[in-house]
Swiss-Prot record:
Binding annotation for Mg(2+) 2: D227, E228
HAMAP family: TrpD
UniProt cross-references to InterPro entries, sorted A to Z: Anthranilate_Pribosyl_Tfrase, Glycosyl_Trfase_fam3, Glycosyl_Trfase_fam3_N_dom, Glycosyl_Trfase_fam3_N_dom_sf, Nuc_phospho_transferase
Protein name: Anthranilate phosphoribosyltransferase
GO cellular component: cytosol
Lineage start: Bacteria, Pseudomonadati, Pseudomonadota, Gammaproteobacteria, Pseudomonadales
Organism name: Pseudomonas syringae pv. tomato (strain ATCC BAA-871 / DC3000)
EC number from the UniProt entry: 2.4.2.18
Record's cofactor remark: Binds 2 magnesium ions per monomer.
Protein residues bound to Mg(2+) 1: S94, E228
Subunit structure as annotated in this protein's UniProt entry: Homodimer.
Amino acid sequence: MNIKSALNRVVNQLDLSTDEMRDVMREIMTGQCTEAQIGAFLMGMRMKSETIDEIVGAVSVMRELADKVELKTLDGVVDIVGTGGDGANIFNVSTASAFVISAAGCTVAKHGNRAVSGKSGSADLLEAAGVYLNLTPVQVARCIDSVGIGFMFAQSHHSAMKHTAGPRRELGLRTLFNMLGPLTNPAGVRHQVVGVFNQALCRPLAEVLLRLGSKHVLVVHSQDGLDEFSLAAPTFVAELKNGEVTEYWVQPEDLGIKSQSLYGLAVESPAQSLELIRDALGRRKTEIGQKAAEMIVLNAGAALYAADHATSLKEGVALAHDALHTGLAREKLDELGAFTAVFKQENEA
């Protein structure tokens, strides 16, 4: 199916099959469509609402065209990532959590990008911390193998996305592509925590990942609107495990953490986010740093559970608490910066 045929279907509120969506996405991602066609298709899909079949088709093409990171094993390798777009401008919780996960002895293949609507994306934060971003897939694999954590800069691995950049920017609205980033990890991880901007997406995206071969995934959205586990409100979870998706709510107290407000956790820049994270990961914390640490532990614990490094969410949170308070997570952040600096010298020589 070509994009003109797809547009005719979509404007009449008719769904595409997985194979039809693959055909259209391949046209879009290989530069065969005009920007007007891409913009019209994205808006038509949003107004119709994307189906699980359509998202599966779109994700499979993005994965197919990605510059992949080949790891020795995917067993227990985890990613923690969010769609963004929650409007809260909270510090980079998932990125900070990644270093706690690594400090707990679990391998992390982190996928992320610069901020689109927020103040600080994962790439912005890591760059502020001195981490070199423009790594080759082989260099990322070496980071993961040697440091226990590596960062895959989305724009370096999904070059075909350049064809959608103009229409997405000009539309200025959430589209199908806001959902695709967290589902297209270039290392092909099968264990994830995925935060989403709308609770209604939790189960559908868990179903998408089930069909695409994921093993253990938590897709989450908090009652106070965050695309991650919240310290201040219950969080809704769609959990994919053992080939089935179950749904439930989790309170911080269920996991041994006291609920408290998010006051003080919003940031205005990557530098401010980094300052708060270094405070939270350090041995001596300010009051706000302690609160940030609790938020990090909550989310890192969920990822340790998704990685099957823990047998329950509560056990994962306990392991994350211990790992954060050793100070090793902060050392991991510095270690990744030093390790990638060597690649920067190689690449820019």
